[in-house]
Each structure stands twice: as C-alpha cells, then as structure tokens.
C-alpha cells in the first residue's frame, strides 16, 4: 500500500520566535462550558485542530450556536444545557473531547451515541463510565467500555469520588456531570492533575472549592449552579511548544523562543525535567491571562545529562514523555522514566512505539511495563528509522524532531494525524530552519523496524 509520509533531515541550526498554537485542553473546555452556559461566550486563540473542531461540531449537535468569526476566534451561544442530538456524535481522534462531552451530557434527559476513528474506538472509556454510572447515567457499548457507545443521561445524584489513578479527564467528566446532579459533585485526587476545569468553571461563574490535604486535593462543586457566558483567551499549548523547544535543545547552534506559552504549575513537568537535565532555558515576560500564568520561553542548544524523572511528576507532563524520550536520546547517560503506564492507553501504546522507534534510530532503550529507560551517548544519534506511528500525532512529531538533529533522515507515516493537535507543525518548524519534507513512498509500514 502506498502511503504519504514525512521525512526530517538535519539542516543546521534552528532560530526564530514562534507562538504555540492554543492549548488543546483549554480549547475543548472553552467550547463545552460555553455550550453549557447561558448566553454568549467569545473565545480567542482557540486551537483549530481536528480534535477541537470535532468538539465544536458536537456542541452544535447538542443545540449550541457555534460560529467561527476569524482565525482562532469563535463565538458560542449557549442555551444553558444540552438538547438531544439528532445524529451520532463523531469525535474523530479526540479522547479528551469525548470523555468531557460524555460527562457534560450525562446530566440531561437525552440519549446520545458517540463514535470516533479506529484509534479512539479502541480506547477504553470505563474509567469515565464508572463514576457516571454511580451518579445514575446508563449506557450501551462494546466490550471493555469501547465506542461506539450510547449514553442515557438525566436525574443524576451527588457523588464523592476518589480517583483510582491520576486523570484530569475523569475528574473533569465528574465535575461537568456534577453541574446537573442533585447536590453537585466531589472529587478527591491523591496526585494533582491539570486544573483547567476548576479554573474555567470559576470563570463561568461557578463556585468550586479546592482544598489541599495531606493526602491530596479535594475538589467540591456545589449543586444547583448555572453558568454564564464569558470571554476566554486561550494560551499557547505547552505540549505543542515542547516540540520546537526540544528541537532547539538538541540541534547545535539553535535558539528558539516560544511566545505566549501556558505555565500552569500542573503543566510544567517537562520544563522542570529539562532543567534537571541541564537545558539552557529562560522564561521572560511572565503575565496573567484569564487566570492562567503565561510567559515566553527560550531554549538554546544544550549538552543534556540523563536524569531519573520522579513518578509523581507524570501527571504534569504525561503528553510530553515522547518528546522527553527524544531529548534523552541526545543526552549523556541514562534517563529513567517510570510511573507512566498511562502512556499505554493514549492514542497508541506510546511506551511501546517510542521504545521501538528509538531503537530503529540506533538509540539504546529498555521498555518496562510502566516506563522506559533511554541511554544517550551525548549528542550522537544515528537516525535512519522509518516509523509506523499507528496514527499517533505525538509519536510522529517526536520522531520528526529526532530526525532534525540525527545523522540520518527519519521518516514517519500517516502525517495527516499531526493535524489532530498541531496543524501548523511542519510550517512552524520549516520557518525555524528545519528540513521537513512530504514524500509519497512505498510500503512505509512493511519494512519498518517499528511494526504493528
């Protein structure tokens, strides 16, 4: 089968200033909360990726008015709740979108059927369905809690739910369901996860009480609250900013600045880890935008050293481990990443794919059930891998960054999937001086060292 793919080659230093695309987590929540609210919500800087557009279409299907008024500028006319959709809700590849939407929809007297692409249909939804079921929602789905799934909502009761493992998506789904539940909702998390839902609920006029306890965080959402439309400025996504920043760190002579990057304290695990590795990073122009800390971050080529990442840091950088593994490949010594089993149930088994992809590029890597160990040789990476991504955008972008600094080109298949989170990735990296080219090759997957 002939498949289009992208190839990245070493092309000298990367230099320039860019702005990261809007944060994906906040973009999903802006649309969903805007649809649940009464009145107009205006959003600036929305990430216009396929994932987020799927959520926008879903909000229209649930009865909200959703209009694009300019680049990154959207208006959501909420009706104070969800109406029953007239068709199946296709969430594409958007795992965040479907889980949050199911939580929001569970509180209304409706039936809604959700599906997605082959990747999303293979991802289990049980972690979200369990608390929603305890609140009173019901559903019919495939084995293992997989899509397609029909959710029946309405008449929810209060829940006090302890997260069995860190998950901002599960926490957010419970809180969104709690908006319509009799008595609201309470969530306890032993490890703090990204708190955009709590912050944004307050921005829409809701009361949310967060208490720091010795064993974790308790979030209480009182019942009977109505949301009101508001204005939202979406900051730059740190998960997307990670790619140009790490590319600069591993490419000799490089200096790249990412403007307007979100620095939420629960999203900066990668920056902290890169700092531990000796990365030359500077943070300037720190300011507050819409209740979130935002700044400009500059990365310069650095001689990195291997480190052991604390497992408790995982929730603050769970999406960044693939690109951290690339940084580790160029570092001196061992980088140990443990407590990251969540990576196995993302868009793909990211531990397995990164381990196989790095090995295909000549990097020493050990795969573990809940982690991996990458041993770098101080800047020397052979490259040359032809990578099967299994449709995972972060696997694709991480290996392309590796190819920008490796001795031999690196190719990835299914490049169209990059648009699920970072539609302007290739153009941005080319603007900084990277050599990334699209080709139509032979059977990209069949002879790849990274098989199915």
From Swiss-Prot:
Chain sites annotated for binding 3-phosphoshikimate: 24-25, 29, 167, 169, 319, 346
EC number: 2.5.1.19
GO biological process: amino acid biosynthetic process; aromatic amino acid family biosynthetic process; chorismate biosynthetic process
Binding site for phosphoenolpyruvate: 24, 95, 123, 169, 350, 394
Xref: PANTHER family: AROM/DEHYDROQUINATE SYNTHASE, PENTAFUNCTIONAL AROM POLYPEPTIDE
Function text: Catalyzes the transfer of the enolpyruvyl moiety of phosphoenolpyruvate (PEP) to the 5-hydroxyl of shikimate-3-phosphate (S3P) to produce enolpyruvyl shikimate-3-phosphate and inorganic phosphate.
Protein name as catalogued: 3-phosphoshikimate 1-carboxyvinyltransferase
Species: Phenylobacterium zucineum (strain HLK1)
Lineage of source species: Bacteria, Pseudomonadati, Pseudomonadota, Alphaproteobacteria, Caulobacterales
Gene name per UniProt: aroA
């Amino acid at each position: 089968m002939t498949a289009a793919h992208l190839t990245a080659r070493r092309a000298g230093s990367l230099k320039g200033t860019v702005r990261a695309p809007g944060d994906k987590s906040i973009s999903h929540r802006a649309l969903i909360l805007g649809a649940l609210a009464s009145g107009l919500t205006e959003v600036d800087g929305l990430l216009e990726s396929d994932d987020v557009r799927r959520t926008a279409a879903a909000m229209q299907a649930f009865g909200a008015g959703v209009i694009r008024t300019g680049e990154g500028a959207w208006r959501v006319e909420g009706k104070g709740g969800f109406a029953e959709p007239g068709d199946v809700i296709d969430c594409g590849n958007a795992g965040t979108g479907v889980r949050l939407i199911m939580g929001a929809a569970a509180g209304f007297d409706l039936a809604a059927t959700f599906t997605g692409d082959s990747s999303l249909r293979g991802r289990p939804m049980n972690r979200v369905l369990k608390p929603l079921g305890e609140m009173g929602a019901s559903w019919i789905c495939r084995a293992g809690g997989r899509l397609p799934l029909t959710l029946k909502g309405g008449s929810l009761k209060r829940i006090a739910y302890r997260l069995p493992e860190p998950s901002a998506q599960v926490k957010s789904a419970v809180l969104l369901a709690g908006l319509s539940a009799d008595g609201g909702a309470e969530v306890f998390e032993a490890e703090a996860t990204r708190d955009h839902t709590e912050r944004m609920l307050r921005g829409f006029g809701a009361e949310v009480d967060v208490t720091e306890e010795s064993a974790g965080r308790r979030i209480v959402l009182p019942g009977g609250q109505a949301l009101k439309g508001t204005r939202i400025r979406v900051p730059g996504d740190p998960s997307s900013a990670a790619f140009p920043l790490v590319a600069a760190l591993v490419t000799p002579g490089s200096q790249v600045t990412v403007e307007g990057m979100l620095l939420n304290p629960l999203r900066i695990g990668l920056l902290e880890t890169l700092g531990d590795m000796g990365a030359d990073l500077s943070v300037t122009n720190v300011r507050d935008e819409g209740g979130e800390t935002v700044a400009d971050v500059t990365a310069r080529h650095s001689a990195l050293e291997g480190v052991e990442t604390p497992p408790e840091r995982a929730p603050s950088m769970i999406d960044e481990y693939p690109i951290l593994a690339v940084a580790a490949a160029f570092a001196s010594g061992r980088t140990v990443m443990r407590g990251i089993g969540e990576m196995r149930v993302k868009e793909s088994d990211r531990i397995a794919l990164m381990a196989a992809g790095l090995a295909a590029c000549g990097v020493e890597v050990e795969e573990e059930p809940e982690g991996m160990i990458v041993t770098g040789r101080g800047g020397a990476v052979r490259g040359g891998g032809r990578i099967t991504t299994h449709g995972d955008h972060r696997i694709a972008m991480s290996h392309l960054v590796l190819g920008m600094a490796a001795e031999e080109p690196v190719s990835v298949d299914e490049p169209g999937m990059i648009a699920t989170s970072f539609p302007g990735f290739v153009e941005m990296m080319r603007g900084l001086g990277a050599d990334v080219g699209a080709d139509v090759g032979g059977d990209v997957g069949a002879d790849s060292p990274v098989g199915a």
